[in-house]
Amino acid sequence: MKRHLISAADLTRDDAVLILDTAEEMARVADRPIKKLPTLRGRTVVNLFFEDSTRTRISFEAAAKRLSADVINFSAKGSSVSKGESLKDTALTLEAMGADAVVIRHGASGAPYRLATSGWIDGAVVNAGDGTHEHPTQALLDAFTMRRRLVGADTGLGRDLDGRRITIVGDILHSRVARSNVHLLTTLGAHVTLVAPPTLVPVGVEKWPCDVSYSLDDVLAKSDAVMMLRVQRERMNAAYFPTEREYSRRYGLDGERMAKMPEHAIVMHPGPMVRGMEITAEVADSDRCTVVEQVANGVSIRMAVLYLLLGGSDTALSAAPARTEENK
């Protein structure tokens, strides 16, 4: 792997499979009474969040703590950033404090890249979401969830998603999750189809390594996984569709539409969900929906990323006991 994780497009197939396989090892820790490894003891991980977050911030914090790293949580609200401090000065402050890794979420696309290439800090930089650009660890946990469900947790080691057909539905225009997933899933051999109203499809999407459809019903029967995306109204300054009811009628996933999917197919959502709009309660609460699994898998994936970027102790990892009936 490279020194930083800025974009899913930076990952080769071997990089991605290594992260997924390492995450399987990390998942064993979650089955233990004491969910902790000493592998990053003495290292400092800073969660630098300029945007609100629940799942991602808590997930990174849990991941770092399970690896025994010291964690500093930084929120732009209530900090000197709210007084006008620049990203550079914030980064220099973190460097002075000895940060070994900085996990950054920022509203500006490209902020993590700037932090990683500026020379302001020496530590590893992990992109936890930048504007509408990318969210690579979300794509990794999505791929991890797909591999576990569609290939198998035990039989999936070393394998990718070759031949799997993944459909991503919703606000593609504003979705950093969609962009990262398109890059990563195609790298892993999957075939990706984007489904959205024409107004929520980005300009230049024809250059992306995926297909585009404007009809959800046309693609459900041949999908191994359907990922629903929230409409990001906070990034909109105009009307992109007539009404929420009309959007839900054409692009929402309900029980009737879910029944058109193959029996093995799964329903995914990166969260937060808006029940009744892009997904109904019936679908969200069904056994085919992996939302809760994705949250749990996110901790394992982020443990793997931090472990690999910071050169954790292989001895500590190999000391984690295998999953057995006794320690489940």
Curated annotation (Swiss-Prot):
GO terms for molecular function: amino acid binding; aspartate carbamoyltransferase activity. It catalyses: carbamoyl phosphate + L-aspartate = N-carbamoyl-L-aspartate + phosphate + H(+). Keywords: Pyrimidine biosynthesis, Transferase. The keyword Nucleotidyltransferase does not apply. GO terms for biological process: 'de novo' pyrimidine nucleobase biosynthetic process; 'de novo' UMP biosynthetic process; amino acid metabolic process. Transmembrane segments: none annotated. PANTHER family: ASPARTATE CARBAMOYLTRANSFERASE, ORNITHINE CARBAMOYLTRANSFERASE, MITOCHONDRIAL. NCBIfam families: asp_carb_tr, PRK00856.1. Heterododecamer (2C3:3R2) of six catalytic PyrB chains organized as two trimers (C3), and six regulatory PyrI chains organized as three dimers (R2). This is Aspartate carbamoyltransferase catalytic subunit. It comes from Streptomyces griseus subsp. griseus (strain JCM 4626 / CBS 651.72 / NBRC 13350 / KCC S-0626 / ISP 5235).
